[in-house]
A protein has these predicted regions:
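N-terminal Rossmann NAD(P)H-binding glycine-rich loop of SDR-like oxidoreductase domains
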Residues: 4-24
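Catalytic helix-loop patch of NAD(P)-dependent Rossmann-fold dehydrogenases
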Residues: 83-98, 111, 119-167, 174, ...
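SDR active-site strand-loop-helix element
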Residues: 7, 32, 69-73, 112-118, ...
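NAD(P)H-binding glycine-rich loop region in Rossmannoid oxidoreductase-like domains
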Residues: 51-91
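Conserved glycine-rich Rossmann-like NAD(P)H-binding loop of the short-chain dehydrogenase/reductase
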Residues: 26-36
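NAD(P)-dependent short-chain dehydrogenase/reductase
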Residues: 124-130, 152-213, 217-228
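Conserved cofactor-binding/catalytic machinery of classical short-chain dehydrogenase/reductase
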Residues: 53, 68, 95-98, 135, ...
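Rossmann-fold cofactor-recognition segment
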Residues: 42-53
Length: 230
């Protein structure tokens, strides 16, 4: 049985990924979370790990000895990246650098999936659509910049230390159980509150001129599994 490690598995995507990997895929799964997070999952080994503490990363990888690693841990809120840029840089860049350093030091032979973001592209000229991996990155917020930096660091480590790293730029996810921090779930929550008479019949929205691709989270995690396996 193949063993996998999900780093940062207490979030929206991580929970779906854990269910899919233990269920349909039949992997032996370990999941890391922050100490203050609550995560109960009978079919996986749950481990507390601070990504900013390199020694904890070393201990977890030694304990789990995974064949595949899914690196989901991130500060993923664009709004929070503006109000707390230091946290965003620490988690998304310094935390990932800790992981990369440990992978280098132990000469990790397995495959690692690092999750970037469609936000990295930023402003895209109409003539550049449809975009590809070669489209110029013009990140327009701090979160996007940290994700771009994460993936550039990973590319350097992959070449310099022969690490098997796969990087994706995932666009917006949607699905049941998503936090109202995100746009679709926020709109849905407001609609339900209006229908229940809990608020005035007005939906508060942000910039409606932005165009984004949305993917069901269940399709996203199936694609992630394919990327580490094939």
């Amino acid at each position: 049985m193949k063993k996998v490690l999900i780093i940062g598995g207490a979030g929206f995507v991580g929970r779906y990924l854990a269910e899919y990997l233990t269920g349909e895929c039949g992997y032996e799964v370990s999941i890391t979370k922050m100490k203050q997070e609550v995560l109960e999952y009978a079919d996986a080994d749950i481990l507390d790990m601070d990504l900013l503490a390199k020694e904890e990363v070393e201990q977890v990888l030694a304990k789990c000895a995974p064949d595949y690693i899914f690196h989901l841990a991130a500060q993923s809120s664009v709004a929070l990246s503006w109000s707390n840029p230091q946290l965003t840089v620490d988690v998304n860049i310094k935390g990932t650098l800790n992981l990369l350093d440990v992978l280098k030091e132990i000469k990790y032979p397995g495959r690692v999936l690092l999750i970037g973001s469609g936000e990295e592209y930023g402003y895209v000229n109409p003539e550049e659509v449809p975009i590809s991996e070669d489209t110029v990155l013009r990140p327009g917020n701090i979160y996007a910049a940290t994700k771009g930096c994460q993936n550039m660091l990973a590319a350097i480590y992959a070449r310099a230390y022969q690490l098997n790293l796969v990087m994706v730029r995932a666009f917006n996810h949607v699905g049941p159980r998503q936090s109202p921090q995100f746009v679709v779930s926020d709109f849905c929550k407001q609609v339900v509150e209006v229908e229940k008479g809990l608020r005035e019949p007005v939906i508060h929205v942000g910039n409606l001129k932005a165009k984004r691709d949305f993917t069901d989270v269940r399709d996203v995690i199936a694609a992630y599994e394919c990327l580490v396996r094939q």
